[in-house]
Amino acid sequence: MNQTVELNYDMLADKGLRFANYLIDLVLQYGIGYLIGLVIGLMYKHLNVVAPYELITNMGGFGEVVFSYTIMLFYYFIFEATTQRSPAKFITGTKVITFEGEKPSAGTILKRTFCRMIPFNAFSFLGELGKGWHDTISDTYVINVKKYEEALQLKNSFEEIGSGIKE
């Protein structure tokens, strides 16, 4: 039995799911940033570890952007390279695949993740096909897992029927 099926555009996650993914992941990334700040503050207060505290409190606007992008890069790369899904994609039942229906390589996920830093990328999925620039540039797709699995099951059923006829 095949474990992949070629992409059908009906399988693509709709714009509502894509927007939900964006919002959920954004909130979680802010939460991670908050937790990092909390840990640094507690280390400063209780253990007198000064260097990280001074770094965070004196970083300025550019430093805050670098800090945010660093969290974002690690967040998406770790989750999508290992599971094809960010936490939001688990919640909404979506995942990242290639056109052939396969798991993208780590290099492809890294490219996809860096493309998220393109200004206004977060809203680029609002176009006609619901594909963001980070999808288009990395040649990946965000699909509805349920629809994908239904198509895979149908394909495997036809293959079983076909193999039964040959025997």
Which sequence ranges carry the predicted segments?
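Membrane-interfacial and juxtamembrane segments of integral membrane proteins
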Residues: M1-E167
